């Protein structure tokens, strides 16, 4: 073992060497997309690691102490398209720092304390479209060297130290600029000269955000004849007077959308005064949006008269106190009221209005009927409404409605089948509690409906005609509902144009084989989060256009081999993740199919085994077929061994007494026999045996010694053992007394079977058959072997007559004398008798 002092002397230099290694020489970055996307965030790097390939297109180097960017800092990565250098402590960017990045489209410099920008700091960025320089100590746009970036579309210099709104001359070169974010700077005044470049060369698609600047003054006429896409002024004014004067300073502006208001956590104005918006009469506005004003009084609505010709009005997070109705002379075509608070549901009398969004509001009284005859688009989502009667022309006051959104509300009772609303193309009830929707064909008149969402509406589908009439439907979402007996029947008979169907989280356990027979155009089917136990592919066979099938988050164990052939040929994406797969040899064909279909299966690496326990969590791709071959061999060998042992046991059990007889034959083969004959007979014939057989043979001349069970068997020993050991082993011959009782006795037949084996094993053995009476052939044939023996061999037949008796006893004694040791006296007596 190495001494402690020597060990320390070895480790300390090694640790010192490792501490000197820079992270750049390791492999610290996360490879998100191989050779394309790398994330190196917050790794204490001082430069780009050497292992990053030159083919990289997306690189995140944020939160690393890069400090200074020298010339050609990124020349090794000519394919870069996105570069994030947020909070890298960058203080100096030298000339040509980004030289060679001809494909870079997004550059993020957020949170760098830049002290010096060389004139050519951004040279070489010929394709740059987005530049984010938030919180980078920029004090003036004129000193920001970006005039050559002609492809720039978005410039974000928010949260800097810019005091002047003057747009530099180089903005005239940025004809593609669409978004300029100057929010949260130090701009207080806006003068006509600041917008000189926009007067000379208008940027018609430019959206300008000046929010959170402490504006005090906008020179009247500064925006005259200026055309903008969007202007945002939120939380800019510290008083209503300043806001009113500033809005008047916007006179002459032509703008697509104007956004005014405050932010939730940046409130400067306590009350909204109707005079604030008077200056809007001097602007040409297409869309107007106002957000986060408290105490928006009823008379403040009069200020909307200056917005009478605006096409779209958005009112967000406002409190309308006492508002009952809107002015009649407004020409609005779209009205959005979102996250507002009303004391009562307002009365709408806007005849030109085509679109109404009334969403996520708080209304203290109940929903009342809407009377807007021109309305085509109605969004009443997220208001916690309860509708006792829905939905018809009488409820919504229009016959032109094409879009109806009642999602995320309370209880909605479907009392009529959309009478007068036959033009509907979009209908959304998701996460509202629907009543009576499955009682009848509620959607029958909606021949033009293309989109229907009844997800999570507590609907139990029991009526098979629930979707009758929806002949134009293309998208059906009904996740989170239930079906009778958790079985999916064919309820889509008329939905022949359906392309997307969502049946996720419906507690489905089984799917009818004909459930999808009427959906030839279906392209996407979501069956995830159900309780399916197997991958039954037969229901999907008619879906010839199916491209995506999601069966994830079920309880699928496997699929039968013959079922895997029935997937539609156009299927390109199959999701089977998060199931209860059994990685056992029984499903070997399915496991092999998973390996063969890697391109078809989504996240196949995430498909893991759930059973057996020793493989739980193991990727299915790691399952080896060789394991099954070994197991098959072991199982086959084990089964064969068990069967062999079982066969041996059965044979031993069946021929146990025959084996005992064999052992006895070997033991007694050389010795003298104790008995001349062992008598096998039925207990019903015992009188004849005692009175005739025993008396004549044992008391006759010569005398014969017979073995009889009632007299010679040893007490306490099993009957079968006595039969073999006392009967067969100690007897020269066997006398079988055949009678009707004998044939019907199981013990007699057993003894006779042992006698046959005994005769086969012992060369001296002989069986003498005595037939007491005539036997019916039908009865005798029940014992086939006995019947054959009596037909092939000579036997004695008992006749109860003087002559018959004489012949019988003479023949029997002769048979018994055969093989008996000769005795002169006995032989003489026998001859005399």
UniProtKB/Swiss-Prot annotation:
Pfam families for the chain: LRR_1, LRR_8, TIR
LRR repeats by residue range: 55-76, 79-100, 103-124, 127-148, 151-172, 176-197, 205-225, 227-236, 352-373, 374-394, 400-420, 423-444, 448-456, 472-495, 497-518, 521-542, 545-565
Domain LRRNT: 24-54
InterPro entries for this protein: Cys-rich_flank_reg_C, Leu-rich_rpt, Leu-rich_rpt_typical-subtyp, LRR_dom_sf, TIR_dom, Toll-like_receptor, Toll_tir_struct_dom_sf
Transmembrane segment boundaries: 633-653
Cytoplasmic compartment segments: 654-833
Record family assignment: Belongs to the Toll-like receptor family.
Description of how the protein assembles with itself and partners: Belongs to the lipopolysaccharide (LPS) receptor, a multi-protein complex containing at least CD14, LY96 and TLR4. Binding to bacterial LPS leads to homodimerization. Interacts with LY96 via the extracellular domain. Interacts with MYD88 and TIRAP via their respective TIR domains. Interacts with TICAM2. Interacts with NOX4. Interacts with CNPY3 and HSP90B1; this interaction is required for proper folding in the endoplasmic reticulum. Interacts with MAP3K21; this interaction leads to negative regulation of TLR4 signaling.
Name of protein: Toll-like receptor 4
Source organism (scientific name): Felis catus (Cat)
Protein's gene: TLR4
């Amino acid at each position: 073992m190495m001494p402690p002092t020597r060990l320390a002397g070895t480790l300390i230099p090694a640790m010192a060497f490792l501490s000197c290694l820079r992270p750049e020489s390791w492999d610290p970055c996360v490879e998100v997309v191989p050779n394309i996307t790398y994330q190196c965030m917050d790794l204490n790097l001082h430069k780009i690691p050497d292992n990053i390939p030159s083919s990289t297109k997306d690189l995140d180097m944020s939160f690393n102490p890069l400090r200074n960017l020298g010339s050609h800092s990124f020349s090794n990565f000519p394919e870069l398209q996105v570069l994030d250098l947020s909070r890298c402590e960058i203080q100096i960017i030298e000339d040509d720092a980004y030289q060679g990045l001809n494909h870079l489209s997004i550059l993020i410099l957020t949170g760098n304390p830049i002290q010096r920008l060389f004139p050519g700091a951004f040279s070489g960025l010929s394709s740059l479209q987005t530049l984010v320089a938030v919180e980078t100590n920029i004090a003036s746009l004129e000193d920001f060297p970006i005039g050559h970036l002609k492809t720039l579309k978005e410039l974000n210099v928010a949260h800097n130290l810019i005091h002047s709104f003057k747009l530099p001359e180089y903005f005239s070169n940025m004809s593609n600029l669409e978004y300029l974010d100057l929010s949260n700077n130090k701009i207080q005044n806006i003068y006509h000269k600041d917008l000189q470049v926009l007067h000379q060369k208008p940027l018609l698609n430019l959206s300008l955000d000046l929010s959170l600047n402490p504006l005090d003054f906008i020179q009247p006429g500064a925006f005259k004849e200026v055309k903008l896409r969007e202007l945002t002024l939120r939380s800019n004014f510290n008083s209503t007077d300043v806001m009113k004067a500033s809005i008047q300073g916007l006179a002459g502006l032509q703008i697509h959308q104007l956004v005014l208001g405050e932010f939730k956590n940046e409130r400067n104005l306590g009350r909204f005064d109707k005079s604030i918006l008077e200056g809007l009469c001097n602007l040409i506005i297409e869309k107007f949006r106002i957000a986060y004003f408290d105490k928006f009084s009823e008379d403040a609505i009069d200020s909307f008269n200056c917005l009478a010709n605006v096409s779209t009005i958005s009112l967000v997070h406002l409190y309308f106190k006492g508002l009952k109705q809107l002015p009649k002379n407004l020409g609005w075509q779209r009205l959005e009221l979102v996250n507002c608070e009303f004391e009562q549901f307002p009365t709408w009398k806007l005849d030109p209005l085509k679109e109404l969004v009334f969403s996520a509001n708080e209304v203290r009284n109940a929903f009342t009927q809407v009377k807007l005859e021109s309305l085509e688009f109605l969004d009443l989502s997220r208001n916690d409404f309860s509708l006792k009667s829905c939905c018809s022309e009488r409820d919504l006051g229009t016959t032109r409605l094409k879009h109806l959104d009642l999602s995320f509300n309370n209880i909605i009772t479907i009392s009529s089948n959309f009478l007068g609303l036959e033009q509907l193309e979009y209908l959304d009830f998701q996460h509202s509690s629907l009543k009576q929707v499955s009682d009848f064909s509620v959607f029958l008149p909606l021949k033009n409906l293309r989109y229907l969402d009844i997800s999570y509406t507590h609907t139990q589908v029991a009526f098979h005609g629930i979707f009758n009439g929806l002949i134009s439907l293309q998208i059906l979402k009904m996740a989170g509902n239930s079906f009778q007996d958790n079985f999916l029947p064919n309820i889509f008979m008329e939905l022949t144009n359906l392309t997307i169907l969502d049946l996720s989280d419906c507690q489905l356990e089984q799917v009818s084989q004909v459930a999808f027979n009427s959906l030839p155009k279906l392209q996407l089917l979501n069956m995830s989060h159900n309780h399916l136990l197997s991958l039954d592919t037969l229901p999907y066979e008619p879906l010839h256009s199916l491209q995506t099938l999601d069966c994830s988050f079920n309880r699928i164990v496997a699929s039968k081999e013959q079922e895997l052939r029935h997937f539609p040929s156009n299927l390109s994406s199959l999701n089977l993740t998060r199931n209860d797969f059994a990685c056992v040899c029984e499903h070997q064909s399915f496991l092999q199919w998973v390996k063969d279909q890697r391109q078809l299966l989504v996240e196949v690496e995430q498909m893991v085994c759930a059973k057996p326990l020793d493989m739980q969590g193991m990727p299915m791709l790691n399952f080896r077929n060789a394991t099954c071959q070994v197991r098959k061999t072991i199982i086959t060998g084990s089964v064969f061994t068990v069967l062999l042992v079982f066969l041996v046991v059965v044979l031993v059990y069946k021929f146990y007494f025959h084996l005992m007889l064999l052992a006895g034959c070997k033991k007694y083969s050389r010795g003298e026999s104790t008995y001349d004959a062992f008598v096998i007979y039925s207990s019903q014939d015992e009188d004849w045996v005692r009175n005739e057989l025993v008396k004549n043979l044992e008391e006759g001349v010569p005398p014969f010694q017979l073995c009889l069970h009632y007299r010679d068997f040893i007490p306490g020993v099993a009957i079968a053992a006595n039969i073999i050991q006392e009967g067969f082993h100690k007897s020269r011959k066997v006398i079988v007394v055949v009678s009707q009782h004998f044939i019907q006795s199981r013990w007699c037949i057993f003894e006779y079977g042992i006698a046959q084996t005994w005769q086969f094993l012992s060369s001296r053995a002989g069986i003498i058959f005595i037939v007491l009476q005539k036997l019916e052939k039908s009865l005798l044939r029940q014992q086939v072997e006995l019947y054959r023996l009596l037909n092939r061999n000579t036997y004695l037949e008992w006749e109860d007559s003087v002559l018959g008796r004489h012949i019988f006893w003479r023949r029997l004694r002769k048979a018994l004398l055969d093989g008996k040791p000769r005795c002169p006296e006995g032989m003489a007596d026998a001859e005399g008798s």
